[in-house]
């Protein structure tokens, strides 16, 4: 899930953010408030490479397909003035699966030293609408925990010893909040 703002360096790259392969049903207030704020925080880390905070920042984002938002009825109307709903199988009325969680796996590198942090966020209307760093840290997890929850092997191209070490834990102090 690449945000449009992540791809402002050229028109074609930005257009790619609107492909169907980059779309996932999200509760409006979740997308527009909490998730957007988390994306902006991560964008500041990516853009801080120019200030030499990090040399590189790698980000993987998505929604769970192994855990779906079942039997959901929203309390806030969507743009079409309907309440968002899912059935017992976690699908919308049009048959789209709706993730119960959205995640980010983030890896930074500075002078050959790697740091990671993951976020495993419940797809909900009730998250803070003006989240702070502390609000984000409620859902911060190690990459190992994120891999356990999603079934995805993140950063598998790192040398095994580095991957094993950096994915085991995270420290909020490693990130420029």
Could you describe each region identified by the protein language model?
Residues 1-177:
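Domain-level detector of nuclease and nuclease-like folds
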């Amino acid at each position: 899930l690449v945000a449009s703002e992540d791809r402002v360096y050229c028109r074609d790259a930005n257009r790619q953010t609107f492909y169907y392969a980059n779309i996932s049903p999200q509760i409006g207030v979740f997308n527009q408030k909490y998730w957007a704020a988390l994306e902006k925080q991560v964008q500041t880390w990516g853009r801080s490479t120019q200030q030499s905070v990090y040399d590189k920042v790698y980000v993987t984002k998505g929604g769970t397909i192994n855990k779906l938002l079942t039997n959901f009825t929203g309390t806030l109307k969507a743009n079409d003035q309907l309440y968002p709903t899912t059935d017992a199988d976690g699908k919308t009325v049009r048959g789209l699966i709706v993730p119960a969680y959205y995640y980010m796996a983030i890896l930074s590198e500075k002078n050959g030293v790697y740091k990671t942090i993951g976020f495993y966020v419940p797809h909900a209307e009730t998250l803070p609408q003006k989240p702070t760093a502390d609000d984000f840290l409620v859902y911060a997890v190690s990459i190992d925990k994120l891999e356990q929850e999603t079934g995805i092997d993140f950063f598998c191209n790192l040398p095994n010893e580095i991957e094993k070490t950096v994915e085991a834990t995270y420290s909020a102090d490693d990130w420029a909040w």
